[in-house]
């Protein structure tokens, strides 16, 4: 992005997109974006250096800003939808990590998997411990 006086408002130098599948975690996305960014830089740098790069004006209606994530936002609400819980966990893995409270201690949760298992337990109840992997319904 070309620099401008306002935050994140400059013209776009070049852009590419990537598909994010339903189970991709933050670390996987970071790696894929680093490769994509490297390739984009290699492809775009010559046009910047020789002055032929076509600036793309940003559509101000599509601009978004990333905000700092608070500890409260890291807390998993097991009464939320399965998709929202899963997306929070994978979006916050490995840093800062989503968490739940267990016996008044913060338990970081880095991975999740959606299943079709139906439980009669209250959401967030640990129902199985297998090889140090805790299953939470």
Regions found by a protein language model. Name each.
Residues 1-65, 72:
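Donor/substrate-binding cores of folate-linked one-carbon enzymes
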Residues 67-80:
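Acyl-group handling in specialized metabolite and lipid biosynthesis
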Residues 54-57, 77, 98:
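Short, hydrophobic secondary-structure boundary micro-motifs
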């Amino acid at each position: 992005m070309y620099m401008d006086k306002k935050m994140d408002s400059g013209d776009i130098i070049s852009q590419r997109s990537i598909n994010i599948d339903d189970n991709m975690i933050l670390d996987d996305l970071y790696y894929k974006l680093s490769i994509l960014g490297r390739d984009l830089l290699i492809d775009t740098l010559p046009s910047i250096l020789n002055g032929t790069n076509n600036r793309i004006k940003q559509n101000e209606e599509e601009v978004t800003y990333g905000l700092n994530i608070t500890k409260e936002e890291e807390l998993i609400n097991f009464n939320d939808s399965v998709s929202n819980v899963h997306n929070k966990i994978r979006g916050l893995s490995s840093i800062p990590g989503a968490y739940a409270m267990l016996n008044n201690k913060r338990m970081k949760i880095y991975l999740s998997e959606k299943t079709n298992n139906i439980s009669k337990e209250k959401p967030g109840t640990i129902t199985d411990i297998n090889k140090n992997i805790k299953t939470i319904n």
